[in-house]
Amino acid sequence: IYTGQLVRDCANLFERKQELLTEWSSVFESGAGIIAISNAIENTSVVDIATTNFEEIINSEKLNGNVGDHFAKPGANDRIWNSLQKHCMKDPQNFIDYYCSEAIALASEAWLGPNYQVTAQVNRVNPGGKAQNAHRDYHLGFMSGERSASWPLHVHAMSPYLTLQGAIAHCDMSIESGPTLLLPYSQLYRRGYIDFSNEKYQKFFDKNAVQIEMTKGDAVFFNPAVMHGAGNNKTKSVKRMAN
């Protein structure tokens, strides 16, 4: 867990920046696989404006029949697919203010190197929304275990190096509201893309996954092969939004 101010300080000092990038790369590859950054977006009013933009997009898309998530039950959540482009088109200045975060830049560079490309989707888990099924993401995570098994093992090992997963909190996230469940070190399990839907593995995840409370503007970044899933939103009023 790191403070946003430490990250911003390191961003402007070459040696400290390189030390931080090296540390994070090691965490993503062979450590817990996860870092958290408090106050990753320094000015939370930027987050508030983005939240308003996202809510307006969600409401507009609902009128056109947009549905939520392939890893959650219908009605549990709302999604904005390709929120990056939609955000930019709706409010270019807020888009710039939001994505100029040093935390986003350094976390991405630590794992992907320079010249990475950003994609984004919004997930808003509504009050009473049930947890997602635990899963991995990109690129082998969006198919059955039987299908992913048709790729050789070295592809399973390579795939997580092509993407970094991250999320910015758009509201305060208590444990009761169900912040993302994560299974530290699970990126080290080479067969994870094949076995993640296995009932035995799902039960292991349920028993051992961890959560951290987040406040608005905090961020979490993790190796996409880390088993994860949105938690149960047990609140009656919190619409838990992350981008």
Predicted feature locations:
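Beta-sheet entry/capping signal
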Residues: 32-35, 115-116, 179-180, 218-220, ...
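Short, solvent-exposed loop/turn segments at the edges of secondary structure
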Residues: 131-133, 161-163, 237
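Asparagine-centered strand-capping/turn motif at beta-strand->loop junctions
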Residues: 232-233
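A short hydrophobic beta-strand segment most commonly corresponding to one strand
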Residues: 184, 236-243
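Double-stranded beta-helix
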Residues: 147-151, 157-229
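Catalytic micro-motifs at enzyme active sites that drive phosphoryl/nucleotidyl and oxygen chemistry
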Residues: 23-25, 153-156
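A structural signal for short, well-ordered beta-strand segments
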Residues: 120-122, 166-168, 242
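Non-heme Fe(II)-dependent double-stranded beta-helix
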Residues: 1-146
